[in-house]
Amino acid sequence: MDVKNKMVAESMSFYYDDYQALKNISIAFPENQVTALIGPSGCGKSTFLRCLNRMNDLVPKTRMSGRIMLGDLNIYNPKIDVVDLRKKIGMVFQKPNPFPKSIYDNIAYAPRIHGLVRTRQETDALVEDSLHKAGLWNEVKDRLNDLGTALSGGQQQRLCIARAIAMQPDVLLMDEPASALDPIATQKIEDLVLELKKRFTIIIVTHNMQQASRASDYTAFFYLGELIEFGKTDQIFTKPREKQTEDYITGRFG
């Protein structure tokens, strides 16, 4: 079966002032698959993830070379509208960050602003659909007017996922989305990731090796700003080609 790539980084380097945080990264992310980015703290994986929707544009004295393509679109083309780009590439952060609004408005706010919904009926349908996809609807359907911040940590994170997918992105980026959650909530997030890949291409940063092996199709190992190895998750975890990869996933360093 031919693999279609949704997003591709080509010879990408990234600098904080004079410090080179990422060194000549080339990687392709298959469509409707989950790719896990692993590596020790400070290896560049979260910096790389933020490059994929230009979040690092907000950081002073940074620069990037190379290309990142979303389909035929070079996302660093100066003519690109970054707000429009981030509609195509959603982001879920490590710490749940619901808006201080109702559960309903957490989902409806951005689609209203961007004109994705025009009537109350359309908005209701989008809110319900997004909460269903995030596995949260049955838990909150009778209290949509409650504050999103009143939910449990795991529910807040699924609300943030629902908020991201309400914008109907092509790609969903997740930066350690379960690291602040208990094991039960973590399992729900992992199950959700496997369900969501039917509709979205997912790129997830994780420090949890078991999570990477359970919830991803492909794995990329970063070390000191370099992409050391990339391949199917089964191969990376059972027969890694590089000794550094093997040492990391077996706990010898990192």
Curated annotation (Swiss-Prot):
It is found in: Cell inner membrane. One of its GO terms (biological process) is phosphate ion transmembrane transport. Disulfide bonds: none annotated. The complex is composed of two ATP-binding proteins (PstB), two transmembrane proteins (PstC and PstA) and a solute-binding protein (PstS). CDD domains: ABC_PstB_phosphate_transporter (cd03260). Residues 7-249 form the ABC transporter domain. This is Phosphate import ATP-binding protein PstB. InterPro entries: AAA+_ATPase, ABC_transporter-like_ATP-bd, ABC_transporter-like_CS, P-loop_NTPase, PstB-like. Part of the ABC transporter complex PstSACB involved in phosphate import. Responsible for energy coupling to the transport system. GO terms for cellular component: plasma membrane. It is a peripheral membrane protein. Belongs to the ABC transporter superfamily. Phosphate importer (TC 3.A.1.7) family. It comes from Chlorobium chlorochromatii (strain CaD3). GO terms for molecular function: ATP binding; ATP hydrolysis activity; ATPase-coupled phosphate ion transmembrane transporter activity. It is an enzyme of class 7 (translocase). It catalyses: phosphate(out) + ATP + H2O = ADP + 2 phosphate(in) + H(+). Its EC number is 7.3.2.1. The gene is pstB. PANTHER family: ABC TRANSPORTER I FAMILY MEMBER 17. Pfam families: ABC_tran. ATP binds at G39, P40, S41, G42, C43, G44, K45, S46. Keywords: ATP-binding, Cell inner membrane, Cell membrane, Membrane, Nucleotide-binding, Phosphate transport, Translocase, Transport.
